[in-house]
Amino acid sequence: MSESKNRALFLDRDGVINIDSGYIWRPEDFLFNDGVFDACRAAREMGYLLVVVTNQAGIGRGLYSEQDFHALTDWMLAQFRAEEIEIERVYFSPTHPEEGIGIYRRESPDRKPGPGMLLKARDAFNIDMSRSVIVGDRETDIQAGINGGVATRILVEGEEDDPASSQADVVVGSLAEAVAWLSERENA
């Protein structure tokens, strides 16, 4: 008998979990979006593993270090744990193909729209991509989902992209709305 596969809710960080106010690397600059904890709790109750997939070009551009990113990530995960919410893992891509410095100036399959982070999570957590969802605030997140075979793609409307031209399955205003949409769809 084969082991059953998990389904995941892949979350972009900046713009989905927190307010995207530019390159964020300090806890004092990190503001959670309204409803994030309740939405993540509801998604866990629906059986989704929570996996964060985030481009962090600020590292590649020399604006902050990988150590700064990890310190902020540890702080963020502690906030989730305080709310009794488990995030399976945070994957990040520090590269930028044009504006990266040194080792960070390169193409990477991990940098969205590449599917590398999604595929690493798939392999690490036995994830069935055909039952999984990605939520992002940019079309590059949606494209990463397509490239990684993620069945459902949800765009949180932001300032960057035109929702009318998105390849997302649905466009919503927040992660809370995304999880509510998933819940309604599953209970239909």
Residue ranges of predicted features:
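Asp-based, Mg2+/Mn2+-dependent phosphohydrolase catalytic module
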Residues: 2-7, 67-89, 97-134, 138-188
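Active-site neighborhood of HAD-like aspartate-dependent phosphohydrolases
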Residues: 2-51
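Short, small-residue-rich loop/turn micro-motifs
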Residues: 13-15, 19, 94-96, 157
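Gly/Ser/Thr-rich helix-start
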Residues: 16, 59, 63, 137, ...
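Short, solvent-exposed loop/turn segments at secondary-structure junctions
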Residues: 25, 58-63, 100, 142
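Short, solvent-exposed loop/turn segments at secondary-structure boundaries
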Residues: 28-29, 62-67, 105
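Ser/Thr/Pro/Gly-rich low-complexity disordered regions
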Residues: 45-48, 91, 171
